[in-house]
């Protein structure tokens, strides 16, 4: 099965993608891991991407798309894959369609106010690196595991989360329109768009995804 997972920051997309890929026995391919692997292995696209990154520039779509195509051509993708973090735009979705046909796109939907609560309430222990939510802590400044001091990452501050969600919606709403067939530019293949309520317990989200893919 060939899948794409969509979901805003804080929706638990990475966790669900890892679980579903293990269940289906297909590789979980995240954009970040793919970049790191291609650069480490010094593949042609990895070296090209590294030049842009080292120069402090955004990696162009053409390089990202070539890297995805390179990765999907590997033997472990013969029976399917799960893409996490690609495509991010309609242009990337159209490019993906030119070399691989998807079976389904899973969109994990969570209201913005719940995402704000999840992310801004997250704390990290400076000592053991454990991650906790303040709702589960007796003292939000103290790690319940090792007693170390906890802190809020810059990425989890309200102004940062607001900007990340805005960027996600601007990029993703046209993409959802594309896969649903309702957008100005739309997908014409057999791929189905599945919207999952991500505002549930993680195990219930997982069950909902598997049921929808049957």
How would you describe each model-predicted region?
Residues 1-214:
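Glycine-rich phosphate-binding loop of ATP-dependent small-molecule kinases
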């Amino acid at each position: 099965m060939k899948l794409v997972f969509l979901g805003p920051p804080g929706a638990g997309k990475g966790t669900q993608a890892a679980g579903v890929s293990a269940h289906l026995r297909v590789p979980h391919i995240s954009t970040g891991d793919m970049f790191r692997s291609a650069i480490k292995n010094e593949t042609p696209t990895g070296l090209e991407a590294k030049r842009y990154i080292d120069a402090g520039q955004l990696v162009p779509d053409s390089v990202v798309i070539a890297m995805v195509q390179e990765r999907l051509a590997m033997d472990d993708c013969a029976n399917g894959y799960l893409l996490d973090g690609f495509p991010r735009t309609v242009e990337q979705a159209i490019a993906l369609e030119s070399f691989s046909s998807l079976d389904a796109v899973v969109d994990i939907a969570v209201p913005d106010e719940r995402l704000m609560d999840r992310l801004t309430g997250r704390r990290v222990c400076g000592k053991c690196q454990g991650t906790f939510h303040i709702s589960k802590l007796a003292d939000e400044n103290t790690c319940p595991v090792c007693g170390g001091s906890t802190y809020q990452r810059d990425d989890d501050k309200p102004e940062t989360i607001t900007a990340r969600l805005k960027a996600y919606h601007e990029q993703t709403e046209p993409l959802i329109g594309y896969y649903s067939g309702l957008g100005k530019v739309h997908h014409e293949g057999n791929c189905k768009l599945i919207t999952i309520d991500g505002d549930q317990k993680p195990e219930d989200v997982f069950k909902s995804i598997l049921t929808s893919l049957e």
